[in-house]
Amino acid sequence: MASCDEVRQLKKEHTRSLTMCGHVGFESLPDQLVDRSIEQGFCFNILCVGETGIGKSTLINTLFNTNFEELESSHFCPCVRLRAQTYELQESNVRLKLTIVNTVGFGDQINKEESYQPIVDYIDNQFEAYLQEELKIKRALFNYHDSRIHVCLYFIAPTGHSLRTLDLLTMKSLDNKVNIIPLIAKADTISKSELQKFKMKLMSELVINGVQIYQFPTDDDTTAKINGAMNGHLPFAVVGSMDEIKVGNKMVKARQYPWGIVQVENENHCDFVKLREMLICTNMEDLREQTHMRHYELYRRCKLQEMGFIDIGPENKPLSLQETYEAKRHEFCGERQRKEEQMKQMFVQRVKEKEAILKEAERELQAKFEHLKRIHQEERMKLEEKRRMLEEESVAFAKKKATCELFPHQSFLASGSSIRRDKDRKKTDGASAFCDCITAQENVRLCISSQRKEMD
């Protein structure tokens, strides 16, 4: 199976070159492109990474010869945050939309372990916003404000020793997401000999730790020589200042010290001119292209691969977007059916488990009901037995009462004389018996009433 490069080479070999018989007019295409680009304008986004007070804002002001009036940052920020500001600049008839992203509070925390993470997240968020705009059905990239970072100016403190661990971690995290240009800030604070040793030490550490910084391109013959020479001067040692001081007969941007003057645009004093030449005058468009063709494409490819889109099938066969879409659609449909079947089985299983629980609860309730019913019946039988016994006692008592009421008359008819002789004694005995009968009758009535209440 031929690779894509072989296919393109084969097509190129079958392309015929012809000589035109006259003027057509497509020679004006470069002019058309220039006119359209001038009409649209350009955008350029710079990320400045460095600790607070290292001179980021001053250098940006000096690079574009403009006072952007950024707010001063505090040294007591609890976390790192990024502050983006966009400006409209115009030079001759060329308009530039410049966005400067400053890292506020970078390196000011005691725990610097995650100081680089907000920077990585910001760059990824800009890539994601552009990708979402690109994936829309109705895209508007012509009017879309591209906020992707084109270059990262990484400011290194002029310690004269080596890179800090935070600097290595940060640059290592950013080198596959943005074009990094390392800068030695405030280069006028160390001597020239120390500066050269410091440059060599920094480049050696970057190579050893595998940090990929931006290399000025040498594939274009018009800029290959100067770019190749400038690659040997990295990292640039820079000084920034908007103050103008009179040197000789002219005013120059410089910094005044008791021991002398450091001229910003003097190549013998610092590398500011080299930085401006490489960043703005020569390689600004290459930085924009590298951001789109390399870093953004890497992010886009990873995102599409996460979504399941691939260019080559299992048999190293090129796949079109439609084929990939159909394959993913078939895969998702199968996955959905499988999950639906799993959910149905899970639902049936849970229904069975719930039914078993309910049946067990029903059996327990039925057993409890039968137990209570049996107890109630036993209690009722006991009460019925007590009621029957009380009724029998009541009937016996009534008979006894009737017998007691007839007893005095029978005694009078059988023995009148004895009654008269014992008149007083019998009257007393009759009254006592009558009272006892009344008391017994009341007790029986109260007992019957109490039993009926218990039965009710």
UniProtKB/Swiss-Prot annotation:
The Septin-type G domain, residue ranges: 40-306
Taxonomy, superkingdom: Eukaryota
Predominant location category: cytoplasm
Signal peptide (residue range): none
An example Gene Ontology biological process: cytoskeleton-dependent cytokinesis
Residue numbers spanned by region G1 motif: 50-57
Molecular functions (GO terms): GTP binding; GTPase activity; molecular adaptor activity
Compartments reported by the entry: Cytoplasm; Cytoplasm, Cytoskeleton; Cell projection, Cilium, Flagellum
Residues binding GTP, per UniProt: 50-57, 105, 186-194, 240, 255
Region feature G4 motif, mapped onto this chain: 185-188
Keywords, sorted A to Z: Cell cycle, Cell division, Cell projection, Cilium, Cytoplasm, Cytoskeleton, Flagellum, GTP-binding, Nucleotide-binding, Phosphoprotein
Any one cellular-component term (Gene Ontology): cell division site
Post-translational modification: Proteolytically cleaved in vitro in a calmodulin-dependent manner.
Xref: InterPro entries: G_SEPTIN_dom, P-loop_NTPase, Septin
PROSITE patterns in the record: G_SEPTIN
Phosphoserine: modified positions: S418
G3 motif: annotated segments: 102-105
Quaternary structure and interacting proteins, as annotated: Septins polymerize into heterooligomeric protein complexes that form filaments, and can associate with cellular membranes, actin filaments and microtubules. GTPase activity is required for filament formation. Interacts with ADGB.
Family the UniProt entry places it in: Belongs to the TRAFAC class TrmE-Era-EngA-EngB-Septin-like GTPase superfamily. Septin GTPase family.
Function: Filament-forming cytoskeletal GTPase. May play a role in cytokinesis (Potential).
Name of this chain's protein: Septin-10
Gene designation per UniProt: Septin10
